[in-house]
């Protein structure tokens, strides 16, 4: 089955430039400083943020805050049962990318010698897992009230026969499809995370990049609305 | 989450409990509000989410696997269910990396013991044995998303919910070449001219009336309690994980497992008292679950998170 | 061991220089360091040098059972060793985050980009496959570690040849290289990595930064491209804030570099193949080390044309005695030269006379005689020791003093015309000792 049918529809009925429905809920986790549950269609991600708190001696940085990320998937999140929820190479790599991305966004100079923990749990993975984690983390950080340069938004884009497709599902994430996960701040042209899977021809690079950037801007609009609504809902508590 | 309370608070708590009054107004045998929702995940064969008192949050997911085994190599029939409890780092920073592995393994082992006679207890579980050398393997995985005491209780409720939600496909077993068997999904033809793949597969459900339940009974001072909050867990003398199963023949409860969690000393009479309390509480819980499972409407999967 | 951090003044100087477009090794901001690539004498080994960064890669293959998930695909395993030899901050036997990143990148480039045909590595589906192992050892670190490691690994894979196999009904026959020529791996394309450093929020681009420069930069990005103008990997090494245009620019720079380096790799492999097919013994890694070593000298081997001895009696029974020195023969090996017992005294007397006659032509100047006699003593000591070890009689042991410009013409102590009786008897004693 081809990814884009002859009429121009994808397997789940979307158009190539259409993203899935985004559903969010903030403040689920009572123990954490900030938490967010985010859905990109069938991909469900839970993110919890702890901190900033005094860091352990091994991780302490004198001039800025240390960011520790952990990406884990539940054993029942994928199509086949996975034995190890975390600790394998792929999860460590994604954790590292999340750390690097958010080090650029969070104003770490405001909290020297402290640590911020970001934990992402993928409850159900149906493609674009990394992008969903970045979005969930941005909202969780906003919920925790940690100062940032802006809300980061991410999207995964692939290309099929010179046509870009955005927000891939797991059925579309095949071994042959080149895809780029891009994260930007506030939908502007400031890229904080870039990850490429499979080989991409250089002529297609600018096409994919532009599509990804546009999608990030769209996702940012959704996330910004969510953050504003949450703030309005909390305003009575703040005594405003 | 590590809760630190002062000695005066502990004293207040212990003396209150000994008079059957807890800090949040419950009695010693009361549970916190339980929210149970099934069918939460569409990617699993059965799932359930349980919230205890709005803080402890456990998600259970079941995945089926077709397993081939060597009947000669196994002396007794192996249990088709395997349990795995994972503490997500969302629950607490201390569970990051390998922090939650030890506690998770302890609870998984307790469940394995509690369900060890499940082939006798659960009436139609033996249907999972398909043919000589093939059976369904039921992998029950639990993910603890939030932690505020009483994790084993929440886990056992989630397991019962998920098992009742589980749908196992019906299969037809036919002999094949080379001594093997071919296993094909059964699709009952209801007439009409639908293609073979479009006919939905027939499913059967497990009967969970007498499913074992794992309860945590703790001893604070001279009183026995169920469902401790984190503050109460700081004051306990000792804790027992007791597995209770409903006996269908006699209107009574069987104890399938007793495990001590943590340290502490217990007298023989205390253990008897605690098991009695566990049976009584289990009775109440079974009734509540039955009522809930009957009256629950099927909602959109995953809706519970958005509430 | 902790590496002392970069001092603030060093950092400021480097940043200032970079901002004005100058670098400490006189390169331009967009200039690469020279790359040296050498393949070893053993098949499947390569050393890559970029500036001061040195990496060695070795490829080996083994037959193994495939995983049940992929029964007809071969397996490629990558192992990286970051030893304290490269950088003192590395821990021995433990891969820190840098090592994990390197392994991840190598896996991405070699495994995930599918540059090697793993299906051709299958011998028997479900039972036997080739497990190819790439070992990468970092010898020295000075920036662009990922580039160097990838290049070394790719060259080693290109160079490697696995043994040829045939399938028999009940077993697999593996041929050695002498029976059937080994088969090279089926490589579709060669991904080449480039490390691009970023400065000033991505406004400036610094190509191929050294270790010191990398510590001052804002961040870096690694791009892997191949000759077919495909981007194989876009790896974010550190945190960065870039625009998409800048990313595209970096990719273009990496692309041109990849094309140049692919040509270099192919050249090196072709040259090595030419040498091997001409049956020339490959130089291997010896050409990487400069041959200027002051602490050892070479001495030319000299062959002594020893005279033949006439036998007086019983010629049929005795072997032809040839007290020749066999050059390159290990005099310490037991039983290398077997000789029979001959009448010693007459033999010795004859030999003496002959040697005296031939030695007469050599002029031994007086000032050297003292030195010569010292050496003579040393030689005697050495001869004593060697004789003691030697089993066979009449074997002459060649001892040369290294460093001497004029090796002694004869092994035996220099015999002057007026030979002492002592000397002869002592010499005889030596012989008798055996």
UniProtKB/Swiss-Prot annotation, chain A:
Keywords: Cytoplasm, Exosome, Nucleus, RNA-binding, rRNA processing. The gene is exos-4.1. GO terms for molecular function: RNA binding. Belongs to the RNase PH family. The lineage of its organism: Eukaryota, Metazoa, Ecdysozoa, Nematoda, Chromadorea. Its main location: cytoplasm. GO terms for biological process: nuclear mRNA surveillance; poly(A)-dependent snoRNA 3'-end processing; rRNA catabolic process; rRNA processing; U4 snRNA 3'-end processing. Component of the RNA exosome complex. This is Putative exosome complex component RRP41. Non-catalytic component of the RNA exosome complex which has 3'->5' exoribonuclease activity and participates in a multitude of cellular RNA processing and degradation events. It is found in: Cytoplasm; Nucleus, Nucleolus; Nucleus; Nucleus, Nucleoplasm. GO terms for cellular component: cytoplasmic exosome (RNase complex); nuclear exosome (RNase complex); nucleolus; nucleoplasm. InterPro entries: ExoRNase_PH_dom1, ExoRNase_PH_dom2, ExoRNase_PH_dom2_sf, PNPase/RNase_PH_dom_sf, Ribosomal_Su5_D2-typ_SF, RNase_PH, RNase_PH_CS. CDD domains: RNase_PH_RRP41.
């Amino acid at each position: 089955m081809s990814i884009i049918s002859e009429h121009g529809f994808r397997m789940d009925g979307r158009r190539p430039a259409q993203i899935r429905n985004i559903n969010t809920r903030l403040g689920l986790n009572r123990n954490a400083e900030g938490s967010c549950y985010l859905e990109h269609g069938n991909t469900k991600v839970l993110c919890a943020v702890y901190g900033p708190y005094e860091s352990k001696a091994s991780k302490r940085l004198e001039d800025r805050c240390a960011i520790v990320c952990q990406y884990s998937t539940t054993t029942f999140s994928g199509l086949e049962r996975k034995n190890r929820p975390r600790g394998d190479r792929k999860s460590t790599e994604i954790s590292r990318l999340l750390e690097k991305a958010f080090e650029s966004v969070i104003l770490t100079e405001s909290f020297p010698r402290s640590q911020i923990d970001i934990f992402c749990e993928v409850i159900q993975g149906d493609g674009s897992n990394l992008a969903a984690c970045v979005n969930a983390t941005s909202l969780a950080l906003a919920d925790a009230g940690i100062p940032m340069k802006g809300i980061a938004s991410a999207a995964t884009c692939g290309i099929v026969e010179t046509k870009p497709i955005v927000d891939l599902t797991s059925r579309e994430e095949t071994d042959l499809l080149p895809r780029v996960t891009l994260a930007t701040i506030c939908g502007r042209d400031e890229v904080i995370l870039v990850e490429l899977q499979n080989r991409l021809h250089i002529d297609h690079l600018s096409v994919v990049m532009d599509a990804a950037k546009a999608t990030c801007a769209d996702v940012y609009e959704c996330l910004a609305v969510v953050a504003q609504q949450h703030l309005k809902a909390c305003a009575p508590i703040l005594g405003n | 989450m590590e809760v630190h309370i002062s000695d005066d608070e502990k004293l207040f708590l212990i003396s209150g409990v000994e008079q059957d009054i807890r800090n949040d107004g419950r009695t010693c045998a009361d549970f916190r509000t339980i929210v149970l929702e099934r069918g939460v995940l569409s990617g699993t064969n059965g799932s359930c989410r349980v919230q205890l008192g709005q803080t402890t949050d456990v998600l259970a997911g079941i995945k089926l696997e077709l397993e081939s085994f060597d009947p000669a190599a196994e002396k007794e029939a192996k249990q088709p269910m395997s349990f795995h409890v994972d503490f997500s780092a969302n629950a607490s920073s201390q569970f990051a990396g390998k922090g939650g592995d030890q506690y998770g393994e302890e609870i998984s082992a307790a469940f394995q013991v509690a369900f060890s006679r499940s082939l006798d207890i659960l009436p139609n579980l033996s249907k999972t044995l398909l043919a000589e050398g093939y059976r369904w393997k039921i992998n029950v995985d639990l993910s603890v998303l939030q932690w505020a005491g009483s994790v084993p209780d929440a886990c056992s409720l989630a397991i019962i919910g998920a098992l009742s939600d589980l749908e196992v496909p019906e299969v037809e077993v036919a002999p094949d070449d080379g001594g093997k068997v071919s296993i094909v999904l059964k699709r009952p033809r209801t007439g009409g001219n639908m293609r073979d793949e479009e006919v939905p597969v027939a499913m059967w459900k497990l009967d969970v009336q007498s499913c074992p339940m794992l309860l945590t009974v703790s001893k604070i001072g001279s009183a026995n309690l169920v469902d401790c909050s984190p503050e109460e867990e700081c004051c306990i003398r000792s804790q027992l994980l007791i597995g209770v199963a409903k006996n269908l023949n006699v209107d009574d409860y069987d104890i399938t497992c007793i495990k001590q969690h943590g340290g502490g000393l217990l007298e023989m009479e205390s253990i008897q008292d605690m098991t009695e309390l566990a049976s009584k509480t289990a009775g109440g819980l079974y009734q509540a679950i039955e009522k809930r499972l009957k009256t629950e409407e099927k909602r959109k999967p995953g809706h519970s998170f958005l509430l | 061991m902790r590496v002392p951090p970069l001092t603030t003044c060093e950092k400021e100087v480097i940043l200032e220089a970079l901002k004005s477009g100058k670098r400490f090794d006189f390169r331009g901001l967009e200039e690469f360091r020279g790359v040296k690539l050498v393949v070893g004498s053993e098949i499947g080994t390569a050393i890559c040098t970029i500036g001061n960064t040195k990496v060695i890669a070795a490829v080996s293959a083994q037959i193994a059972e495939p995983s049940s998930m992929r029964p007809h695909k071969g397996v490629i395993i990558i192992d990286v060793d970051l030893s304290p030899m490269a950088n003192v901050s590395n821990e021995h036997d433990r891969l820190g985050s840098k090592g994990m990143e390197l392994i991840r990148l190598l896996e991405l480039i070699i495994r995930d980009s599918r540059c090697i045909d793993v299906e051709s590595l299958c011998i028997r589906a479900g039972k036997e496959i080739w497990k190819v192992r790439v070992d990468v050892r970092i010898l020295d670190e000075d920036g662009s570690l990922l580039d160097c490691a990838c290049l070394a690994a790719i060259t080693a894979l290109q160079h490697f040849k696995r043994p040829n196999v045939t399938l028999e009904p009940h077993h697999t026959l593996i041929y050695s290289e002498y029976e059937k020529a080994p088969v090279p791996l089926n490589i579709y394309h060669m991904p080449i990595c480039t490390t691009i450093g970023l400065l000033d929020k991505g406004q400036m681009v610094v190509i191929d930064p050294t270790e010191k420069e990398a510590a001052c930069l804002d961040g870096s990005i690694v791009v892997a491209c191949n000759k077919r103008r495909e981007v194989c990997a876009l790896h974010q090494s550190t945190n960065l804030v870039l625009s998409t245009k800048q990313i595209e620019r970096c990719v273009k720079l990496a692309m041109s570099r990849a094309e140049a380096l692919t040509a270099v790799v192919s050249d090196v492999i072709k040259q090595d193949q030419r040498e091997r097919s001409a049956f020339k013994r490959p130089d291997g890694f010896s050409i990487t080390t400069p041959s200027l070593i002051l602490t050892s000298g070479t001495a030319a081997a000299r062959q002594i044309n020893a005279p033949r001895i006439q036998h007086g009696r019983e010629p049929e029974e005795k072997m032809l005695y040839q007290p020749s020195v066999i050059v390159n023969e290990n005099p310490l090996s037991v039983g290398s030269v077997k000789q029979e017992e001959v009448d010693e005294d007459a033999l010795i007397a004859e030999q003496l006379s002959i040697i005296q006659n031939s030695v007469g032509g050599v002029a031994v100047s007086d000032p050297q005689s003292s030195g010569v006699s010292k050496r003579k003593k040393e030689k005697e000591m050495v001869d004593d020791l060697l004789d003691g070890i030697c089993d066979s009689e009449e074997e002459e042991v060649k001892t040369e003093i290294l460093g001497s410009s004029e090796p002694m013409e004869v092994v035996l102590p220099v015999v002057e015309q007026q030979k002492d009786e002592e000397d002869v008897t002592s010499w005889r004693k030596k012989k008798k000792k055996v």
